[in-house]
Amino acid sequence: MTELYAVIGHPIDHSQSPFIHQEFARQTGLGLDYERLLSPLDGFEATVRQFIGRGGKGLNVTLPFKLEACQLSGALTERARAADAVNTLTFRDGQIQGDNTDGVGLVRDIVDNLDVRIQGKRLLLLGAGGAVRGVLQPLLAQHPASLTVANRTVTKAEALVTHFAQWGEVDAAGYDDLAGQQFDIVINGTSTGLSGNDLPLPAGLLAGSELVYDMVYGKGLTPFLARGQAERAGMLSDGLGMLVEQAAESWHIWHGGRPNTRPVMNSLRERLA
């Protein structure tokens, strides 16, 4: 029997999730339909319930509905509660279950695909929005030596320090506060990689870093990664691997087992070239 899944968002035409999940299905021999589901901005819950009525088993949730998905969920995992956001909905036994796989996707990409250890490292996350909030708890679970969140508006970073205190120690900073500091892993969680606007970071901040990582992805280097290259950072990576790994975690939640992500990453990279 073919099961029905989808990715929901607004807009949604750009989503690579159908390609990724169909590739996973091809690996495992599992029959499934996976759609793109465009929801009106003011009609998320109605669209979800209509999908459930069609026999839908699960949804991946993208912008701008991750907070609404959290509010709609009758049961939340710890990582979803920490993030205050849900990107994976499962419809089981009449209940809507919410999870967030973004953070574990990032961790797996860094640790498994890039072979970079997080434990004992000095981490810097740029930005204090939903992308950073979604990955902090899984990063803290890796026991870095330190984790600093830097943001243009320092009070937003300080709010994350308070919220995540139960999961580990987080430091807050403004971009100017980073002058003279060194970090092993620097992760961009802002949207500047999409807009092309440069972050007002101190010159040379990325020079001594083992890994410079941008959560966004696309053709070639993002502006942030180009800066890392110019400052001679050790390794550069965009967020394509994170995208595939968070999808693999959703697959595991829905179907069990773990698909082989490497060939899917390679195929997706070719599609985007």
Swiss-Prot record:
CDD domains listed in its UniProt record: NAD_bind_Shikimate_DH
Active-site residues, as the UniProt record annotates them: K66
Sorted UniProt keywords: Amino-acid biosynthesis, Aromatic amino acid biosynthesis, NADP, Oxidoreductase
Pathway(s) this gene product operates in, as recorded in its UniProt entry: Metabolic intermediate biosynthesis; chorismate biosynthesis; chorismate from D-erythrose 4-phosphate and phosphoenolpyruvate: step 4/7
Enzyme Commission number, as recorded: 1.1.1.25
Binding site for shikimate: S15, Q16, S17, T62, N87, D102, Y217
GO terms assigned for molecular function: NADP binding; shikimate 3-dehydrogenase (NADP+) activity
GO (cellular component) term, any one: cytosol
Keyword Cell inner membrane part of the UniProt annotation: no
GO BP terms: amino acid biosynthetic process; aromatic amino acid family biosynthetic process; chorismate biosynthetic process; shikimate metabolic process
Classification via SUPFAM superfamilies: Aminoacid dehydrogenase-like, N-terminal domain, NAD(P)-binding Rossmann-fold domains
Entry-linked NCBIfam families: aroE, PRK00258.1-2
Family: Belongs to the shikimate dehydrogenase family.
HAMAP family: Shikimate_DH_AroE
Subunit structure: Homodimer.
Name recorded for this polypeptide: Shikimate dehydrogenase (NADP(+))
